[in-house]
Amino acid sequence: MANKQDLIAKVAEATELTKKDSAAAVDAVFSAVSSYLAKGEKVQLIGFGNFEVRERAARKGRNPQTGEEIKIKASKVPAFKAGKALKDAVK
C-alpha cells in the first residue's frame, strides 16, 4: 500500500522537483480538492475520476452495546468515482 510519502517521492521522480517542492504540490492538490468539496462543488479530473459530496439520508441504527434503536442524522460524505482511464489501468 502506498502512502502520502510514497506519492510525494513518485511526483518528485516524475517531475524532477525536490521532495520538498513535491510535498508542497501534493498538499496543494489535496487542499484544493478539500476546499471545493467543502463548498459542495464537484471536482472532475478527466480520465482519472470525480470527487463529489453525497448526501446520506437520515436512518435508524442500533447502539451495539445496548441494542437500543437510535436515530442517525442525515449527513454529507465525500465520495470518489473512478474514471474510465483509471478503471482500464487497474484491470
UniProtKB/Swiss-Prot annotation:
SUPFAM superfamilies: IHF-like DNA-binding proteins. One of its GO terms (cellular component) is cytosol. Signal peptide: none annotated. Keywords: DNA condensation, DNA-binding, Virulence. GO terms for biological process: chromosome condensation. It holds the Pfam family Bac_DNA_binding. GO terms for molecular function: DNA binding; structural constituent of chromatin. SMART domains: BHL. It comes from the Bacteria. Histone-like DNA-binding protein which is capable of wrapping DNA to stabilize it, and thus to prevent its denaturation under extreme environmental conditions. Also seems to act as a fortuitous virulence factor in delayed sequelae by binding to heparan sulfate-proteoglycans in the extracellular matrix of target organs and acting as a nidus for in situ immune complex formation. Belongs to the bacterial histone-like protein family. This is DNA-binding protein HU. The gene is hup.
